[in-house]
UniProtKB/Swiss-Prot annotation:
One of its GO terms (cellular component) is plastid. This is Small ribosomal subunit protein bTHXc. Belongs to the bacterial ribosomal protein bTHX family. One of its GO terms (molecular function) is rRNA binding. Signal peptide: none annotated. GO terms for biological process: plastid translation. The keyword Chloroplast applies.
Length: 101
């Protein structure tokens, strides 16, 4: 408590203020733009990672597919889904070392 009275900062304080702006209309008809929200913060923050990630590390872009050697297969497939009925194996007829004349 004594540190608060003396004015020495004991811990970092973050202050955030919100302000809302909305004009009222006459007879239920709105004459202005939609409500706006403004946010001001006294704390400086480092820029966050972008929400849209593109480039070599993005497997959903052409450059990212080439970089990761995925050859266009960005999303894993369920091997049991959409394959149709199983096919019977095909065996070669006869012995390949014998030739028919």
């Amino acid at each position: 408590m004594a540190s608060l009275l003396l004015g020495t900062p004991s811990m970092a304080c973050h202050s955030v203020s919100f302000s809302f702006s909305h004009s009222q209309s006459v007879a239920g008809v709105s004459l202005s733009s939609p409500p706006t929200l403004s946010l001001s913060s006294s704390v400086s923050t480092s820029p966050a990672l972008p929400l849209i990630y593109c480039g070599r590390g993005d497997r959903k872009t052409a450059k990212g597919k080439r970089f990761n050697h995925s050859f266009g297969n960005a999303r894993p497939k369920n091997k049991n889904k959409g394959r149709g009925p199983p096919k019977a194996p095909i065996f070669p007829k006869g012995d390949p070392s014998q030739k028919e004349d």
